[in-house]
Amino acid sequence: MKLSDVQKRLQAPFPAHAVAWKPGVITKDRSRALMLAHIDARNVQDRLDAVCPDAWSFEVEVVPGTRLPTVKGRLTVLGVSREDIGEAPEGDLGTLKAAASDALKRCAVQFGIGRYLYDLPKQWVAWNDAKREPVSPPELPEWARPDHERSPGGAHLVQAMDQLRYEMPEDLELQREVYKHLKAALGSLHPISGGNQGRAA
């Protein structure tokens, strides 16, 4: 397998719930903010694990003599390496771990992971300065969503499936009930000819 074989999968948009927003610019009266989309370093790791789990690595080297914690990162995917500098933010979050996460994301962009986020249109939104958050988060355009989220209700389905990974009921009967409904829903997408789909365990 070569890098060119998996390029499209690396570059694919992330689910909408995986994209976070932070203010890039806030107006002088603190009423509006220009929001910037970004992803977490864990999203990058998940993407790499999904596409080429045994064929990527990431190394960091601390850059000495800088005001903020700074590292040089090297991401290698299928034998191809990309390097970039990662810098930690000001304040309590200014750690080497934060700098390494920043470096990983910057290196990943060079492989196309999350690069589409830089092409999003500028989005000014109402800003709640007391809560340090937008009154309502921006919406991603259709082209910046995965294919399965471009249909009505798709994003909600993906969120629900993701939630099940961490909140699966412990009770066996409830698990069977969840499985029954999931199997019925999936069966409606790909019906089996003959009408005999079996019963849930």
From Swiss-Prot:
Induction: Induced to high levels following extreme ionizing radiation exposure. Also highly induced in response to desiccation stress. InterPro entries: Rad52_fam. GO terms for molecular function: DNA binding. One of its GO terms (biological process) is DNA repair. The keyword Phosphoprotein does not apply. It comes from the Bacteria. The keyword DNA-binding applies. Keywords: DNA damage, DNA repair, DNA-binding, Stress response. It holds the Pfam family Rad52_Rad22. The N-terminal domain (1-160) is sufficient to pilot the oligomerization process and to bind specifically single-stranded DNA, but is not functional in vivo. Belongs to the RAD52 family. The truncated form (1-160) of DdrA forms heptameric rings that can assemble into a 3-ring structure. ssDNA-binding protein that contributes to the ionizing radiation resistance of D.deserti. Plays a role in DNA repair and genome reconstitution, in a RecA-independent process, since DdrA is essential for recovery from severe genomic fragmentation as a result of exposure to severe levels of ionizing radiation in an environment lacking nutrients. In vitro, binds to the 3'-ends of single-stranded DNA, and probably protects them from nuclease degradation. Thus, DdrA is part of a DNA end-protection system that helps to preserve genome integrity following irradiation or desiccation. This is Single-stranded DNA-binding protein DdrA.
